[in-house]
Amino acid sequence: MGQKINPHGFRLGITTEWKSRWYADKQYKDYVKEDVAIRKLLATGLERAGIADVEIERTRDRVRVDIHTARPGIVIGRRGTEADRIRADLEKLTGKQVQLNILEVKNPESQAQLVAQGVAEQLSNRVAFRRAMRKAIQSAMRQPNVKGIRVQCSGRLGGAEMSRSEFYREGRVPLHTLRADIDYGLYEAKTTFGRIGVKVWIYKGDIVGGKRELAAAAPASDRPRRERPSGTRPRRSGSAGTTATSTEAGRAATSDAPAAGTAAAAEAPAESTES
């Protein structure tokens, strides 16, 4: 069901893409194990960097690693020393040449992984879990591309002896709709009472060939103008924008005009006969 499965895996090939792009026959299991080791290496040493996603692409003799982070300065380090260290560790792990790309995340409040990591950090600092969840929801809903969010915490909440799960939701989060763009993030908070799992679902609208989202985001100048049924525009009188027949005075003036015209036409022949 859509409520239980990972939203990324549920929508692979529909609205989401694979985070590891390579092909192998006999070395498939080795590459999968290596990808897990690469992501674990980047997650353990760069907790403060705010890594949202890691994409891996392989060729015959090269491995390309794209790191999407909210704080690229921490990953790069002073004069690139941290990036060089990470590249050396990855080359030692894979035994191949590594191309490291560090990409900045523009809106970290709308990335589910970063939101989950932020809530987990607050729980580790003894912040009340309800306050942390509501603060994350409020900051995410301020983003224009976020239409709904759900945050769930599971574990010994508040130091209780029995573990439980609580979640808060705002907006729409259609987990069973395949065309829905759902971003999912998971992070664990280490507290004195044990680990608390934080899950975040963010709904960013539907993807139907990209037509609906592009039409909504198009500026007003690019949208087609609606033509009027008649070629001429109605005449307006005054600065208030009223037409000639929209007021009592205007209707009276228009009704008196034909009568005055007929009276003038009737008087004209009479004057000519008298002369």
UniProtKB/Swiss-Prot annotation:
Q: What molecular function terms (GO) are annotated for this protein?
A: mRNA binding; rRNA binding; structural constituent of ribosome
Q: What is this protein called?
A: Small ribosomal subunit protein uS3
Ranges where the KH type-2 domain occurs: 38-106
Quaternary state and interactors? Part of the 30S ribosomal subunit. Forms a tight complex with proteins S10 and S14.
- Record keyword DNA-binding present: no
Which cellular components does GO assign to this protein? cytosolic small ribosomal subunit
Function, as annotated, reads: Binds the lower part of the 30S subunit head. Binds mRNA in the 70S ribosome, positioning it for translation.
Q: Where is this region: Disordered?
A: 215-275
Q: Which organism is it from?
A: Mycolicibacterium smegmatis (strain ATCC 700084 / mc(2)155)
